Design a protein with these regions (language model features):
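Short, Lys/Arg-rich N-terminal segment immediately upstream of the first membrane anchor
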Residues: 1-6, 78-82
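Hydrophobic alpha-helical segments
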Residues: 2-56
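Transmembrane alpha-helix boundary/anchor motif
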Residues: 18, 59-62, 104
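Non-transmembrane, membrane-proximal soluble domains of secreted or membrane proteins
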Residues: 24-42, 67-355
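Membrane-water interface of transmembrane alpha-helices
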Residues: 55-70
Length: 355
């Protein structure tokens, strides 16, 4: 029995070591200012909580040993029921910790708000007045990532790059289900949701190649929904952009509709140009121009609805599911309604940009 137990223990230790060998300390030692502040917040909060946890555990073990049944020297007071000093310590110390945690939470919730533009690129280094954030539009698909650079006019699949020490302004949406964008070295997790737009302001402070992933289960290909994030110098980023323009194709609405079909382990793709208005159509869920946009539906609802007559505006649309089977679903055809109800950024070639 004993040799078997020893062998089992060794096997468990080796298995645990093998499993943990792939772990990385990037979460606690990131290379982006926002992620560094979040790591500091984790450490501060943990230390504050340990101020209560450690003494409680230590006193529990001490009391259990000191007042054990076999210790006849310990004070025995079966009628004791109150101590003002103990009450103050028991209730006062946790209350002070909770107040401290609450204050830290309130301050950092506003300071690290992902929608809040950056006021610094690192500790003691404010954002220069002449530096404009890099705009990046990100779309979580089944099961890949699409990144659109509106200022550069390019797009990539499963590859992201940004200059070091330049603020990045991300806008996120999704094609089908809720997902989560996460680059541990850059910043915390941000949800992506279909028909909605979330944001993140971040900065990378050290050149390198970092892992990015989907941090939320979203179907069969979820585990392969990964990409590489490149932190580059300004010159390297300019060359990277030029490389996409030279070797890439054009990302049109028709190309996007093919790209959004479910697929896993998608290789890196590069697009030299992006059709104007594509991002707005993605968020508004009407890349297929035969379908009604979300903003149009909201305008109809705001006006009281279309009643039974609205059924005449429906149509059947083809769709390929995760297993590759061709199916059909009912969608609403387009109607004439006010534009840009979602407050989307103005893109070249769109009505919002022309107004």
């Amino acid at each position: 029995m004993y040799p078997n137990k020893s062998l089992l223990t060794r096997a468990l230790v080796l298995s645990a070591g093998a499993a943990l060998s792939g772990c990385s300390g990037i979460v606690m030692k990131p290379h982006g200012d926002i992620a560094q502040q979040q790591a500091q917040l984790i450490v501060t909060s943990t230390l504050l909580m340990l101020l209560i946890i450690v003494p409680v555990i230590a006193l529990t073990l001490l009391f259990a040993y000191r007042y054990r049944q076999s210790n006849t020297d310990a004070t025995y007071a079966p009628d004791w029921d109150h101590s003002t000093r103990l009450e103050l310590i028991i209730w006062g110390a946790p209350l002070l910790i909770i107040i401290a945690l609450g204050a830290i939470t309130w301050i950092t919730t506003h300071k690290l708000d992902p929608f809040r533009p950056l006021d610094r690129i690192a500790e003691g280094r404010p954002v220069p007045a002449d530096v404009k954030p890099l705009e990046v539009y990100a779309v979580s698909m089944d099961w890949k990532w699409l990144f659109i650079y509106p200022e550069q006019g390019i797009a990539t699949v499963n590859e992201l790059a940004a200059p070091v020490d330049r603020p990045i302004h991300f806008r996120f949406t999704s094609t089908s289900v809720m997902n989560t964008f996460y680059v541990p070295a850059l910043a915390g997790m941000i949800y992506t949701m279909p028909g909605m737009q979330t944001q993140l302001h971040a900065v990378i402070n050290k050149p390198g190649v970092y892992d990015g992933l989907s941090a939320q289960y979203s179907g069969a290909g979820f585990s392969d929904m990964r990409f590489k994030f490149h932190g580059l110098s300004d010159e390297e980023f300019a060359r990277w952009v030029d490389g996409n323009r030279i070797g890439g194709a054009a990302l049109t609405r028709a190309g996007y509709l093919k790209l959004e079909q479910p697929s896993a382990k998608e290789p890196i793709q590069r697009f030299a140009s992006v059709e104007p208005g594509l991002w707005s159509a993605i968020v508004d869920r009407c890349v297929d121009d035969r379908k009604m946009c979300s903003s149009q539906m909201m305008a109809i609802d705001a006006a009281g609805g279309a009643g039974k007559g609205g059924l005449a505006g429906t149509m059947r649309s083809a769709w390929r599911d995760a297993e590759g089977r061709n199916r059909e679903r009912t969608v609403v055809a387009a109607l004439c309604t006010p534009t840009n109800l979602l407050g989307l950024p103005a893109e070249a070639g769109t009505p919002a940009a022309q107004n």
